[in-house]
C-alpha cells in the first residue's frame, strides 16, 4: 500500500513537472524549458574573468543542455556598447560604473553563432543566436512566482513567441493621427544661428551615392542617453539588471543596423554614453518628471523632449507602463531637411513657447497587462530608432509583403518599420525594407556628421585587418579576394580565412592572389631616402621592416641626412657643423633667409649660407634651400615657393592700421614738426580762417532767411529754370471746408 502511494506521488510529480515545462510563461510565450546549472560555479568563473590578466582567463564558459541540444558558450566581456565617458546617474550621484557583467560570445564549435547577455549572481540572462534560430534566457521568477522550482532560469525559442497583436488594429506604434500632429509640431521649430550650415541646407531630392571603401575612420556611431523610470526599476529590481536590459536592447539594434547597407553607408552602430536610473525612491521626488503613474504616451515623450539632449545622438526613456491602444513605443521622425526631429537634433524653441530636444523616443515593456518578450521589445526599439533615423511606416505592396495575397511573400512577414508590432519570428521582421533604406540613407547622408562619432572598435568590412580579424577584403560587392570571407558573411565566419588558405592579400603585400606566401626574393616595398627596399620572408603576409641606409645619407632633397633609418638630421651634421638660422639682423636679404645655414659648433658668429664662400669646401658652392613652408628669419617668417622669407604678422591689416594711427611716435613727430615750422602752421591757420569767411560771405546772399527785415535772397546765376506748359484758365471753385475734404478723402 505504501509502495503504491509512493508510486502514485512520483508519477504525479513527473507528470506535473512535464506539464510545467510545456506550459506557457505568459500569453506571449507558449513553451519553455528550465535551466538548473550551478550558479555558484558560474559566479566564481565570472569573478575570475573579471580579475583576469591572461587572455585565456578572460573567457567565461557556460555549458548546459536544453531543447534537445547542448549549449557550450564561450563569452568575453563586451566593452563595445559603452563609451569611454560612460557614466551611470542616480538621484544621489554620478558613478563610473563597472560593466564587467556584460558579455558577448558564441557557441564553441558552431560557426556563425552569437550570444550576448549578462551574468548577475551566477545566472546568465540574454539571447543566443544559432543556425536553428535564437534562444532567450531569463530568470524564472520573472514569470513564475513559485520559489520551490527545481530550476532558476527559463529558456525558450523565438518560434515559441506568439504576439497576438502584431496584425491587429492596435498595438505597437501610435496611429496616423498622432504622427500627423507630431509632424505639424516639428515644422514650427525656430532655427538658431548656432546651427551648422549642413543642418540648414536643404536637398532637392534623394542623393543615394555609393560610398567608396576607405581606410580612414568613419563617423558611424550614434551615442545614446538612456533613462529608466521608477516603474522599470521596480520590475527588474536591481541596478545591474536594469543596465543588463539596456545592454541587451542596444546590442540587438546594433546587430540589425550594422548588417544593413544604407545605400553605401555601412557599419552604423550604437554606444551608450550615459544612463539615468530612477529608482523606486524617486517616485515621490518632485524633480522627477516621470513620477506620476498615469501619463499618456504623447505626454511621456514630451517630458523626455523637454530636457536638453544636445550632447547625444538620441535620448530614450525605458518604462514599464501599459499605454492606451497597445502602444509599445513612440519617437520623433527624422527628416533630411524642412522639419526638426530625429538623430542629432538640437534643442530649440517651438510654437508652444518651450525649448525641446526632438532627438528622443520612449519604449515600454508592457502591453495589454502583460510583459512583452525581449524579442518584441528589441524589434520595437529598432522600429522607434528607425523613425529617428528618418523612416516613416512602411506602405505599399513593395514594402509590406506581410499584407500580400501572395502566400510566398506573406510567409516572410513584414519589415521592421511596419506600423504594427511584430513577434520577430518571420524572415523580414529583423530587416529594413527598401522604402526605409531609401529614407534613412538620405537622413544619414545629411546629418550623421553633426553628431556621430568614431566607434574605436574593429570594423569588419573597412579593408583594414584589425583585432579579432584574420583578414578583411570588404563587403561582397567589393571583395575580389578568393582567400577571405567577406563582411556579409555571418558572425564567426566573416573576416576569416577560408579553409586551406595560407593568407589573404588584405593581410599584406607578401600574399599572392592564390592565397600563398610570396617567396623570399620578391620585393614588397620600394626603397626610400633612408631605407632599403623591403623583401618578403616567405612566412608572413606582412612586409618585413626594411634595413636602414647608412647614416648621413642625403635625404629630403639633400636638405637633411639619415639617422638610424629616419630622415632626421641636418645636412650640416654630415660635415661636422651645426644647423643655424640666417637672420635679417645679420644683413641677410629675404632670399638668403631661406637658405640652409650652418655654423661651427658653439660659434653662432660663423652662421652662413651653404652657398657662401665660407662653406665652399663642403658644399662646392651649391646653395641648399629650405622646403617651402619652413620657418625662416629666426622663426619670424616662412619660406614661400619662390624661396623668399615672408614675415608673419599675427595681428593682421586692421591691427597695423590701428597702430599706425594711434602710435605715440606719430604724435611725437607731429609735435616736433610744429615746433620747427611754427610759421607754416600760422600761415595755414590764417588761410583757413580767410577761406571760411569768404565762403560765408558769398553764400549768405543766396540763403533764404526767416527774418522779414532782411532782403530776399538773390537767385544763383546760370541755374536752369523749369518751364511749365501753359495751363488753361479754370473757373474758381468754392473751396470746401477742411473737414468736408478730409471726410471725402477717407471715403475714397
From Swiss-Prot:
Record text about domains: The Cys-rich region C-terminal to the disintegrin domain functions as a substrate-recognition module, it recognizes the EFNA5-EPHA3 Complex but not the individual proteins PubMed:16239146. Both Cys-rich and stalk region are necessary for interaction with TSPAN5, TSPAN10, TSPAN14, TSPAN17, TSPAN33. Stalk region is sufficient for interaction with TSPAN15. The propeptide keeps the metalloprotease in a latent form via a cysteine switch mechanism. This mechanism may be mediated by a highly conserved cysteine (Cys-173) in the propeptide, which interacts and neutralizes the zinc-coordinating HEXGHXXGXXHD catalytic core of the metalloprotease domain. The dissociation of the cysteine from the zinc ion upon the activation-peptide release activates the enzyme.
Chief localization: Golgi
Protein name: Disintegrin and metalloproteinase domain-containing protein 10
Residues modified to Phosphothreonine: 719
Catalytic reaction equation(s): Endopeptidase of broad specificity
GO function terms (MF aspect): endopeptidase activity; metal ion binding; metallodipeptidase activity; metalloendopeptidase activity; metalloendopeptidase activity involved in amyloid precursor protein catabolic process; metallopeptidase activity; protein homodimerization activity; protein kinase binding
Placement of sequence motif Cysteine switch: 171-178
Effect annotated for changing residue 578 to A: Abrogates EFNA5 cleavage
Gene Ontology process terms (BP): adherens junction organization; amyloid precursor protein catabolic process; cochlea development; constitutive protein ectodomain proteolysis; epidermal growth factor receptor ligand maturation; in utero embryonic development; marginal zone B cell differentiation; membrane protein ectodomain proteolysis
All residue ranges annotated as the Peptidase M12B domain in the record: 220-456
Membrane spanning stretches: 673-696
Cofactor(s) the protein needs: Zn(2+)
Induction: By interleukin-1 alpha in nasal cartilage.
Domain Disintegrin as annotated: residue spans: 457-551
Post-translational modification: The precursor is cleaved by furin and PCSK7.
Cytoplasmic face of the membrane: 697-748
UniProt cross-references to Pfam families, sorted A to Z: ADAM10_Cys-rich (PF21299), Disintegrin (PF00200), Reprolysin_2 (PF13574)
Annotated site (Cleavage): 213-214
Keywords assigned: Cell junction, Cell membrane, Cell projection, Cleavage on pair of basic residues, Cytoplasm, Cytoplasmic vesicle, Disulfide bond, Glycoprotein, Golgi apparatus, Hydrolase, Membrane, Metal-binding, Metalloprotease, Notch signaling pathway, Phosphoprotein, Protease, SH3-binding, Signal, Transmembrane, Transmembrane helix, Zinc, Zymogen
